[in-house]
Amino acid sequence: MRESRPVIAARGVLLALALTTMSLSPFAASQATAQIESSDATFNEAVQAVKDKNFRHAVKLFSIQAQNNQHDAQYNLALLLEAGKGAPQDFTRALTWAWAAQLGGIEAAEELAEDLAGYLPEKAIEGVRNEVQERLRARIDEGQSAAVTQFATYHLLMLEEPDFEAAYIWFSIGAALGLEGALEARDEARENVEDEKIVDLQREAGTIYESLEIIID
């Protein structure tokens, strides 16, 4: 039997819950930024549903939060879908949300995503990649600044082989927007790009940048 995973029980609060027949380790503290009051209330209600073993209700509530890009909820939803609690076991959906949570800074999601990818054929994984990519682009088109650096990171971590050129473009855009960590990540990506391609990539980054209407949080 595999070791239990840490799951996020509450924003800033540690609890021990049971998702499997074994005792789970305490939930990891949330890395999400400040949420609106109703969002916290929904999250806490979902956590209580897990404690009460009302997994179906927990999946419903975490799904609402996951769709609204709450990364702690995305991680919890991925755990439930992996376990088949509250919804039939679904490794494809679980990987979608695990990757979203990983891109959102939930460290525990990385190991979960690796395990889930190990259960799936490459064709299914490619489908998840496409879904995650489309979701990120939609968020960028909506003006969500966090999605810019997440999209850059996606090209480094989620593809079969890192795409340093795309990562350089999007980290360049993030740096121009003043997003935290983007400048350093841009320079690291540049080290893996051929010099003769830099001008074209910078031009492409500039064109994309001018087309975006990003809202800085």
Feature annotation, model-predicted:
Residues 120-146, 181-217:
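Terminal, low-structured helical/coil segments at or just beyond the last alpha-helical repeat
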Residues 12-25:
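Bacterial N-terminal signal peptides
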Residues 2-14:
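Bacterial N-terminal signal peptides that target proteins for export
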Residues 42-49, 61-65, 76-83, 114-119, ...:
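Hydrophobic face of amphipathic alpha-helices that form TPR/SEL1-like repeat modules
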Residues 37, 53-54, 67-71, 83-85, ...:
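Short helix-capping/linker turns of helical repeat alpha-solenoids
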Residues 26-61:
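N-terminal leader/linker segments that initiate helical-solenoid repeat arrays
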